[in-house]
C-alpha cells in the first residue's frame, strides 16, 4: 500500500487569494514545500491529508 499526501493551502498574492491542492508521494516533500512557500509567500489554511 502506497500512501500519498494531499496538501491544501490558501496562497495570498498581490492578485488575491488562491486555493491550491497538490499531491505528493512522500511526507518529507510536503514539509519541504511548506517551508519553501513560507519563506517566499504568505500561506494559511494548511491541510494535509493521507490518501490511498
Task: Give the location of each predicted region.
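Short, mixed-charge low-complexity intrinsically disordered segments
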Residues: 36-52
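Generic detector of bulky aromatic hydrophobic side chains
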Residues: 1, 32, 48-49
Amino acid at each position: 500500500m502506497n500512501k500519498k499526501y494531499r496538501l491544501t493551502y490558501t496562497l495570498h498574492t498581490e492578485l488575491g487569494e488562491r486555493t491550491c491542492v497538490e499531491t505528493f508521494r512522500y511526507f518529507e516533500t510536503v514539509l519541504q514545500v511548506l517551508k519553501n512557500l513560507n519563506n517566499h509567500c504568505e500561506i494559511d489554511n494548511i491541510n494535509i491529508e493521507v490518501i490511498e
